[in-house]
Amino acid sequence: MNKVYITGSGLWVPPDLITNDELVASYNEYARRSNERNAAAIASGEVAVVPESSSEFIEKASGIKQRYVVDKTGVLDPDRMCPVIPPRPNEQISLMAEMAVGAAREALNNAGRKAEEVDLVIVACSSFQRPYPAIAVEVQFALGCGGYGYDMNVACSSATFGIEQAANAVRSGSARCALVISPELPSGHLEWRDRDCHFIFGDIATAVVVEASPSGQQKSAWEILGSKAATVFSNNIRNNSGFLDRCDPVSRDNRDKLFMQEGRKVFKEVCPMAADHISSHLAANGFAASDVNRFWLHQANLTMNHLIAKRILGREATPQEAPVILDKFANTASAGSIIAFHQHNTDLAFGSIGVICSFGAGYSIGSHILKRV
């Protein structure tokens, strides 16, 4: 079987940062206004009180301290509570493509590759700003890549699933050098007025170069020793927004048209699924958990990651074994594990073993066993 490598990674970070304190101040002002406006209905029991939030609650519940977004003015406006993202003319690059290009250029630079050497572009992320034309084809055009491109969505597992498809294409010979890019824009589909989830997400874009052989100019290279993907249907993480919304104006703006989850159920079900997935993947490739130098896990919840790592290792993981970027970037959907990899892979010695794993809606879980070469 032909060898395949991840030879570069890149990150695009939005311009605006929102701290928990900023977010809470805006949300609590919204809650105050809503409760004041609905005082009579609340008193009669017709409407529920909108509860206040706090920075302490957010950090305890998630481990998140801040997040980056493409626009904070709209998010922090109590009368709006969503980002201001004006439409662009078709002749101008789309926002998601622009994000993707930024991450891709850094990944190519770190891999020692030029855009024209790329013959496959996969844009893999949890949501898209339009059905067609594919964002990947727009990115391919903007960068000047050859070959072909396509979009794919497996929610928070999109990046790891995309890497597997890129690796398969390289192994089969249908591509020599692939870009897997995850421009995540969850600020656009998050209900910022919901206390249970208003703090969860941040915007970001990541990219990795997957190819048949390193250029020799790369900053680090990791051989993909094995990949594993799994899906099990669940409604516990769901977003019902889609092109059919216009067909039923009555339900067009319902709460379920944005991100929704049954958080406790997700926690209870996904933690053992992810841990067992990684453990069985390692065993199938002849590795014990103790052979792994680093786990780059999906960054959704700090307690969740601690429990998954403990179930795999049989003990608490050290910060070096399972690095956390969640506190700085929040949940960035499919990009989280790739941010962790991007920021925490070059310090490991040659021959080190690492695991990238992401999991999320579907349910879906994707993992890759890597060796530094």
Write out the residue ranges for each language-model feature.
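Short beta-strand segments
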Residues: 7, 124, 153, 178-184, ...
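Conserved beta-ketoacyl condensing-enzyme motif
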Residues: 6, 54-154, 284-305
